[in-house]
Structures are given as structure tokens and as C-alpha cells.
UniProtKB/Swiss-Prot annotation:
Its main location: secreted. The gene is lip. Its EC number is 3.1.1.3. It comes from Pseudarthrobacter phenanthrenivorans (Arthrobacter phenanthrenivorans). InterPro entries: AB_hydrolase_1 (IPR000073), AB_hydrolase_fold (IPR029058). Its cofactor is Ca(2+). Belongs to the AB hydrolase superfamily. Pseudomonas lipase family. This is Triacylglycerol lipase. Binds 1 Ca(2+) ion per subunit.
Length: 319
């Protein structure tokens, strides 16, 4: 053990859509990440929020995270926290930074759809094509039950349709107006914003990174192909990790909705926030948190090492 990742303030890892701290109380969402950081001296807490819910509103993930932040501060005696959010967890972290700025030292977002996800738009469009409207009700009921089952605390505060709406490009534009951040560039610019923000007299350090394993290939008859640059020929990840091929398929849908390069669910442009560490990691959306179970393509970087290096970066910044 050493003090490489021993930050001044505790670190809170904030999960995304469909997440929990431990799936069914067995498998860590942030696979192998909490224990790695702890072995390098970090105080790390893992939030457990609704897997399917919006970020704002009284039942939202934002208020759940705010309550958890206050618990961590009470338990540790610290005055602030460093928030690290994956996927929707980055939007949730921004909520807390906006409404309780004095409790936050930094916000880091990993594969976060700050501008929404073209795949969420696609799913919403597909559900709209059902004239009965039953499919969205049935799917939502199923997903809500799934969310409760996999949640380590069997959290019943699940609303799949609210979660889907939250992640659309239209709804995130509204969210960004309601919870603005200096870390965001101008809408539609595919640029990031400032590396720091001051909210109510409190300074926040802002960082992001994301995977762009899914890249567009040639266009034939108006349909653009997609390739997964994280995997090699006959890559074991295609066999042992079912999410690998699934996220190539969703990434292809995104590319054909003009997302550009992406991680299967979030485009490079959508992930940009604060100081961008990199957008060239050969990761899909789950590789970013070392899932499934640590399996990744032959070309993929080690996400555990990237997060460890970043927590050391926070330490060197004095937070």
C-alpha cells in the first residue's frame, strides 16, 4: 500500500444508468476500481442510486446523491468530496455541484452524455411508432422490476421512461439550461468548456474523458458501417464479453444518426466537459468502468490505471 491516490477529500464514485454499487450485491459496478484506489491510499465511497430515474426532481438521482454526499461528509469529517461519475452519473454529479457547490471540490465525468445519447433518441423514436402505446408501458414495467432486482438495496425508486427521457439529446439540452456549468462548451460546437468553475464562491475542478472504440467506416447506400477499434482479429472479448458486440451494434445506430465516433452509447462530442484528459481510449461504454468483469479488447487501455492516475492528479491539485 502507498499514498499515490491519497487525496485531501474523499472520492465518491457515481454509477450510471442501470447501475448500483454492487449488482445483485455480488458484482461491483466499478469493477476492481474501489479496491485498487484504496490500496493506493484513497478514501473511496461508492454511491448507490436508482438505476433508472431522472437526475432532477424530488425522487431524482441528484437528490439521492446529495444525501449520500452528506452521509460521507458526516462519516469522514471532510468538508468536501471529489465526484467521479460514469455515464449518467456525470449528470448526477453536476446536479450536486450546482445545488450544493460548497460540498464539492471536483467533478470528473467518464463517458457522460452531457449532450444526450443518439441511442436514447433512437429508442424513444421506436417506442413512438407503436400505435397502442403499450410497448413503452410494458418495457418500462419490465425494466423497473429489473432495476429493483439488480439494485443491491432492492431500490424500488425506478422510472425507466424518465431515465430514457433524461438521456435524449432534447432533454439534456433542457438540463444544461437548468443546471449550467462552465465546463460545457457551446451547444453543437463539439468543444469543451472551462477547466474550472466557481459556483456560489466555491471553486470546482472539472475533468472528463471517454472511450471512442466505435468508429465509422464506409457508407454504402446511405448506411454507414461501424467498427470496434478496441478488439483485434479473433478477439476473446467478442466471445467472453457479450456487451462487446452489443455496443458495436448500438454504436452503429448512433453513427447513422450522425453522432460520429462513440463508445456505443455516448459520442465523443457529448462526453466533452472541463479539462479533457483524452477521448482516444479504445473503450466501449462498459470498458470505461472495467466491465464486464475486467474483460476488454486487445487494443483497450487499462481503465483501472487511468482512474488511479486521475485520482493522483486530484491529489497533486490539492483536492
Amino acid at each position: 500500500a502507498d499514498t499515490y491516490a491519497a487525496t485531501r477529500y474523499p472520492v465518491i464514485l457515481v454509477h450510471g444508468l442501470a447501475g448500483t454499487d454492487k449488482f445483485a450485491n455480488v458484482v461491483d459496478y466499478w469493477y476492481g476500481i474501489q479496491s485498487d484506489l484504496q490500496s493506493h491510499g484513497a478514501k473511496v465511497y461508492v454511491a448507490n442510486l436508482s438505476g433508472f430515474q431522472s437526475d432532477d426532481g424530488p425522487n431524482g438521482r441528484g437528490e439521492q446523491l446529495l444525501a449520500y454526499v452528506k452521509q460521507v461528509l458526516a462519516a469522514t469529517g471532510a468538508t468536501k468530496v471529489n465526484l467521479i461519475g460514469h455515464s449518467q452519473g456525470g449528470l448526477t454529479s453536476r446536479y450536486v455541484a450546482a445545488v450544493a457547490p460548497q460540498l464539492v471540490a471536483s467533478v470528473t465525468t467518464i463517458g457522460t452524455p452531457h449532450r444526450g445519447s443518439e441511442f436514447a433518441d433512437f429508442v424513444q423514436d421506436v417506442l413512438k411508432t407503436d400505435p397502442t402505446g403499450l410497448s413503452s408501458t410494458v418495457i418500462a414495467a419490465f425494466v423497473n422490476v429489473f432495476g429493483t432486482l439488480v439494485s443491491s438495496s432492492h431500490n424500488t425508486d425506478q422510472d425507466a421512461l424518465a431515465a430514457l427521457r433524461t438521456l435524449t439529446t432534447a432533454q439534456t439540452a433542457t438540463y444544461n439550461r437548468n443546471f449550467p456549468s462552465a465546463g460545457l462548451g457551446a451547444p453543437g460546437s463539439c468543444q469543451t468548456g472551462a477547466a474550472t468553475e466557481t459556483v456560489g464562491g466555491s471553486q470546482h475542478l472539472l475533468y472528463s474523458w471517454g472511450g471512442t472504440a466505435i468508429q465509422p467506416t464506409s457508407t454504402v447506400l446511405g448506411v454507414t458501417g461501424a467498427t470496434d477499434t478496441s478488439t483485434g482479429t479473433l478477439d476473446v472479448a467478442n466471445v467472453t464479453d457479450p456487451s462487446t458486440l452489443a455496443l458495436l451494434a448500438t454504436g452503429a445506430v448512433m453513427i447513422n444518426r450522425a453522432s460520429g465516433q462513440n463508445d456505443g452509447l455516448v459520442s465523443r462530442c457529448s462526453s466533452l466537459f472541463g479539462q479533457v484528459i483524452s477521448t482516444s481510449y479504445h473503450w466501449n461504454h462498459l470498458d470505461e468502468i472495467n466491465q464486464l468483469l475486467g474483460v476488454r479488447g486487445a487494443n483497450a487501455e487499462d481503465p483501472v490505471a487511468v482512474i488511479r492516475t486521475h485520482v493522483n492528479r486530484l491529489k497533486l491539485q490539492g483536492v
